[in-house]
Amino acid sequence: MDHGGAREWMVVDAAEHMEIGPALARKYDFLIIEDDPYYFLQFEKPWAPTFLSMDVDGRVIRTDSFSKILSSGLRIGFLTGPKPLIDRVILHIQVSTMHTSTFTQIMISQLLQQWGETGFLEHIDRVVEFYRTQRDAMLIAADKWLKDLAEWYPPAAGMFLWIKIKGVSDTQQLIMEKALQKEVLLVPGGAFNINSSEPSSYVRASFSLCSPAQMNLAFKRLADLIKEAL
């Protein structure tokens, strides 16, 4: 759900049809694992509903991440769901990875206790505003350099812009060889296919750390490479 335009389509569709998920789970007797690490990075309110919010008979296990909203170095997330299912997950963790770093767990626990719910949501608002500003800067750079060379939709959440390169059937060589030589770091769309060897005309650009000047320079270089490829 972090792929720019792809995610935007999913949000619109989900708002109208997400209730189908729990209904199908009930009809065919299966569980839903809702993996949504960018949920708290939605740029517009009200936020899209979750499967968990619609769960009435304990069929949804939801996973969230503190890494996206506090610090990536923490490498810690949390599960929400029916207690019997969560208890089984805990038993599995105890005989596999043990658990996430105790130190980082204590840090986050103390921080959340100090903030409370209000402080946590205020922090989320600040994080969202930061990424919204970053997103807008990347959209400006994309519109300046890639308008006639690629297609994209403004992402509704997250920290990535999903771009389709016109006239390029596979971006693997363009991104992993030519772009790298120009010090432009992007991810070719094929990396997100079930079969990563399948060709893809898409690339993913991150706006999490780059400055507007870096975004502008990167897309200028990408535009030059696309023109050469065409």
Model-identified regions with their sequence ranges:
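PLP-dependent class I/II
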Residues: M1-L230
